[in-house]
């Protein structure tokens, strides 16, 4: 995003803290626990950055663990408007995932239910779950976000609706999706396999994809990504190939030779960029009908892929098998995906949304 703004003539300055080399040590973990709730150095650093840079607008991303939401009060004191890019669900859910035991969980949606993170030990560590909970509780009690953030930029409307349900002011919430560089055109052609690109893990629904492959030995599957769950891939069907983590030309070839992509995530995710990446190559995506997947893939005549009932193996299989045997439909959906990419997710389209928001915030201040 910084490169996009700079390309349009904006000056961009950074204030950031890194956890590199700190979180592995016991001292670092304790420091992260405490500073996530209130970080004196993070507050001081924000104050100094505001004095040094004198910005028109502050765009906040991740404040944890070494800056903390308390730093937002410094922006308020300096009279500088704040827009927060909402990458996940951390404003409501301490873990930021809306997920427990591998499936969606919205127990924390009602204000004050942050303690569910401790109750269910969502971080699989009592101390870590407590730390995550306390940061949310403290931020809510002090009003760090509600009092100091002038606009929340959600990456999906699904996120926006969840913030509203949690009591955030709807007038402060905008939807500005992610974007990526878009090619002028794409090469059409019949694909060779059903593709998945992402972490090889259960929460990504890879176990479901592998089971569909087992049931349909005549359909080839290829999965690209880092293996996070080795048990999951100990016995994979013969028609399924793990190609590992790919980048550069190898990744481009992987996308180009696929018939279509499948994302079977059991949780909502934030903004599933793989859908847009597939669209760059004119490839449709099958995804779960929840979270941001529904609005990105869409329904009806304007859809750029197919939706299946989340965590429903049989429905996922139906969608995969049906689309595999419909090359004309694959081509049509792929064309729709590329056109939607150009109309809604180009850097120019997204820049205009950001520029409009920045100008509005500056005018109001």
Regions found by a protein language model. Give the residues of each.
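Conserved donor-binding/catalytic core segment of Leloir-type glycosyltransferases
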Residues: 153, 178, 186-204, 210-216, ...
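Nucleotide-activated donor-binding/catalytic signature segment of Leloir-type glycosyltransferases, i.e.
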Residues: 230-249
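Carbohydrate-associated surface elements
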Residues: 158, 179
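A short, well-ordered alpha-helix in the C-terminal region of glycosyltransferases
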Residues: 315, 322, 329-344, 350-356
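Acidic donor-binding loop of glycosyltransferase active sites
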Residues: 256-270, 283
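Conserved acidic donor-binding segment of nucleotide-sugar-dependent glycosyltransferases
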Residues: 299-313, 322-327
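Short glycine-rich donor-binding/catalytic loop of glycosyltransferases
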Residues: 266, 283, 287-297, 310-311
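Membrane-proximal helix-turn-helix segments that form the acceptor-binding/catalytic region
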Residues: 77, 90, 102-151
């Amino acid at each position: 995003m910084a490169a996009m703004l700079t390309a349009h003539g904006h000056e961009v300055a950074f204030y950031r803290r890194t956890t590199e080399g700190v979180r592995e040590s016991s001292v670092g973990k304790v420091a992260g626990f405490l500073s996530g709730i209130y970080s004196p150095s993070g507050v001081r650093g924000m104050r100094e950055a505001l004095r040094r840079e004198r910005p028109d607008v502050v765009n906040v991303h991740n404040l944890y663990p070494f800056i903390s939401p308390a730093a937002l009060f410094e922006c308020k004191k300096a009279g500088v408007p704040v827009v927060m890019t909402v990458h996940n669900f951390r404003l409501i859910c301490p873990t930021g995932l809306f997920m427990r035991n591998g499936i969606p969980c919205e127990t924390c949606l009602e204000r004050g239910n942050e303690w569910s993170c401790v109750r269910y030990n969502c971080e699989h560590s009592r101390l870590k779950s407590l730390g995550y909970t306390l940061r949310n509780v403290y931020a809510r009690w002090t009003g760090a976000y509600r009092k100091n953030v002038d606009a929340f930029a959600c990456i999906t409307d699904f996120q926006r609706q969840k913030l509203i349900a949690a009591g955030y002011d709807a007038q402060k919430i905008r939807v500005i999706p992610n974007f990526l560089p878009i090619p002028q055109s794409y090469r059409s052609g019949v694909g060779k396999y059903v593709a998945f690109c992402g972490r090889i893990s259960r929460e990504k629904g890879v176990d479901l994809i592998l089971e569909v492959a087992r049931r349909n030995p005549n359909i080839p599957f290829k999965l690209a990504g880092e293996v996070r769950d080795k048990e999951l891939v100990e016995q994979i069907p013969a028609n399924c190939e793990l190609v590992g983590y790919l980048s550069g030309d190898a990744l481009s070839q992987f996308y180009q030779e696929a018939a279509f992509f499948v994302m079977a995530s059991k949780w909502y995710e934030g903004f599933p960029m793989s859908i847009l990446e597939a669209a760059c190559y004119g490839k449709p995506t099958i995804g779960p009908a929840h979270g941001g997947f529904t609005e990105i893939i869409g329904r009806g005549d304007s859809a750029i892929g197919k939706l299946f009932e989340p965590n429903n193996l049989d429905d996922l299989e139906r969608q995969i098998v049906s689309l595999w045997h419909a090359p004309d439909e694959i081509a049509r959906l792929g064309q729709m995906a590329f056109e939607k990419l150009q109309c809604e997710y180009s850097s120019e389209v997204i820049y205009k949304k950001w520029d409009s928001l920045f100008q509005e915030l500056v005018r109001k201040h």
